[in-house]
Amino acid sequence: EEREKIGTPNLSELTLEQLKKLTEFNGKKFTKLPIEVQTKFRLSNIKVTTLSDKSDKQVRFDLFERLNRGGVTLTDQEIRSCVYRGGFNNFIKELAKNQDFIECVHLTERQENDGTREELVLRFFAYLYDLKSFVHSVRDFLNDYMEKADEKFNYSKSEKIFCEVFKTLNAALPKGISKGRKNTPLNLYEAVAVGAALAYLKNETINTEGIEEWIKDSELIKYTTGATNTKERVIKRIEYCKDKFEG
């Protein structure tokens, strides 16, 4: 009786649709389901945890991550999209649709659907504008930057830089940012994209002469393989590419 009191009053009016496993229930209302199924549903507990908008965002991220255990696990960027909502989040989602960026950065089918492309836009601006704050944890660095960026961010200037960088790279790299592989290595992406942006900020131009050769250079490979997320290696690979783009 108590369950009925707090239950969904119009449950009998709902019709099941698009079930892929229990297809025999498609088109049926709750009252037409087998009694044992109805009973199991009514007796099932649903755990609800409320994440307050007033909570510290890092706390919300950590709690969201702990709750994210069953079913399809969300990626860090999918969680960020839920926690750090606002203008900057919307901005990186829009830039992720940039055609030059899509053609230049090749991802797996799974990555195309799990927020990876949006995270790469986030990485671009985080390393471009706030590299000094990076220590070792990429996840924490991106979380911190996503929160900071929403407070004050020059959207028009940043969009211009992003579009110019990937327009130039797409023209210079018909096979995309790669070392002969089908998909773009994320560390190489950071080095090339951010290095190009830094060169553009300094000279308002990006020299791509010889890029298809030096992108496979042994020195750059050294900085983009192995323990690649040390601050020293992140800085060295970005500076290596910046120097090349400056000519």
Over which residues does each language-model region extend?
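Acidic, carboxylate-rich catalytic segments that either coordinate divalent cations
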Residues: 210-247
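Basic- and aromatic-enriched surface patches that contact anionic nucleotides/nucleic acids
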Residues: 1-139, 220-228, 246
